[in-house]
Design a protein with these regions (language model features):
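N-terminal secretory signal peptides
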Residues: 1-9, 19, 26
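Boundary at the C-terminal end of the N-terminal hydrophobic targeting segment
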Residues: 32-34
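An N-cap/entry alpha-helix motif that binds or orients negatively charged groups
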Residues: 41-129
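N-terminal functional module of multi-domain proteins
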Residues: 91-177, 184
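Active-site mouth loops of central-metabolism enzymes
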Residues: 138-148, 198-204, 261-266
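Short hydrophobic alpha-helical runs that function as membrane-insertion/retention elements
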Residues: 167-172, 196-198, 223, 283, ...
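Alpha/beta enzyme core
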Residues: 204-315, 328-329, 333-336, 342
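Helical hairpin unit composed of two closely spaced alpha helices linked by a short loop
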Residues: 345-348
Length: 350
């Protein structure tokens, strides 16, 4: 099958954002222990470790859950490793994310009057420095090797993202009991972090209970990754997750005063259902290829979904984001904002 390549001008992305987004979006901002360094060197944002030293440290702490490959494309030793950050089965869904994004190419525009690129956006009333937010990630014990405490992880992710001018995230991991989720929220409250929260499609009463806790913690927005109902981990004893009907989606939207985005949307018809249920937004995501094998890549399905949405809700996307140009591509083909997973998680190690 022929791969269609798409070309976009950076001039048309992010109100004239130029190549500096590549440096701003992931190279500096996603380092989870960020303290900005003005020196144009490869020293890290803390001034204590180089980027490669951080990656080596991450390998020590995350193998075999993640091997911190030079290029995170679903073709490394992590294939089929779930829990962890590998893709389901032969990891073709993970690989499709990488390949579909790689097929999008950028053209530069050199004749313009933009001297200071503005990459900031409004996220439900909160101005953030770029269309990049940490993706909610749970399970430091079973997804990340268990060598990082919950408090360390939340401080790293949310502290670094906030210093970079964007939002961190905490998650309600599918195998995490309620006290673990409460501990993460408590860390947010203690430090005053600005963040989003990702919830699992648990029983309605359990979701609403977690919504209330998130509201008390001062969260900016909520996501529910509906596709987690199809994960093997749903069989975890005492941690029930389930598919949601249209009526259940409407109930959840009404249950919280916070903006609610439904995650795991990969088709235009389900985007329409979410809009009709009253969702503030959707997240185009195949869960990193970790819920269903052989899914298409998110960059492949995003344009059709955006056409269907037609501005009626906020559209986010995730999938193998590793650098600022990846952000530019997703925004160019229609996303309002991106969620970054592994690049940020790796840089949280110190």
């Amino acid at each position: 099958m022929e791969t269609r390549r798409m070309f976009f001008s950076r001039r048309n992305i992010l109100k004239g954002s130029a190549a500096s987004l590549a440096a701003a979006a992931l190279g500096s901002s996603s380092a989870a222990f960020a303290q900005q360094s003005s020196a144009p060197t490869i020293r890290p944002l803390t001034g204590k470790m180089t980027y490669e030293e951080v990656r080596n440290r991450a390998r020590e702490m995350m193998i075999p859950r993640c091997y911190v490959c030079p290029e995170c494309n679903g073709r490394g030793p992590c294939i089929g490793q779930v829990p962890g950050f590998g893709g389901m089965g032969a990891s073709r869904g993970f690989q499709a994310n990488y390949d579909s994004l790689a097929a999008v190419q950028l053209n530069s525009r050199v004749v313009h009057g933009v001297h200071v690129p503005d990459t900031s956006i409004d996220f439900f009333g909160t101005k953030i420095s770029m269309p990049v937010i940490a993706a909610p990630t749970g399970g430091t014990t079973y997804n990340m090797g268990g060598k990082l405490t919950e408090e360390e992880f939340v401080n790293a992710i949310c502290g670094g993202c906030n210093k970079a001018g964007t939002l961190g995230a905490v998650a309600d991991g599918i195998g995490d009991p309620l006290p673990v989720y409460e501990k993460r929220l408590q860390t947010l409250k203690e430090h005053g972090y600005k963040a989003i929260v990702g919830l699992k499609p648990r029983l309605q009463k359990d979701i609403i209970e977690r919504m209330r806790l998130a509201e008390e913690a001062g969260i900016i927005a909520l996501t529910i990754d509906l596709d987690s109902a199809g994960r093997a981990a749903r069989a975890t004893k005492g941690q029930t997750v389930e598919p949601k009907t249209f009526e259940q989606l409407k109930e959840l939207v009404k249950a919280s005063k916070l903006p609610l985005l439904f995650k795991g949307i990969m088709t235009p018809d389900e985007a329409e259902l979410c809009i009709n249920a009253g969702a503030a937004g959707i997240v185009v995501s195949n869960h990193g290829g970790r819920t269903l094998a052989d899914t298409p890549g998110t960059a492949a399905v995003l344009p059709r979904i955006v056409d269907k949405v037609n501005g009626r809700c906020f559209v986010m996307v995730d999938g193998t984001l590793a650098r600022g140009t990846d952000v530019e591509k997703y925004v160019a083909i229609g996303a309002d904002c991106t969620l970054v997973v592994q690049s940020i998680n790796t840089l949280s190690i110190k």
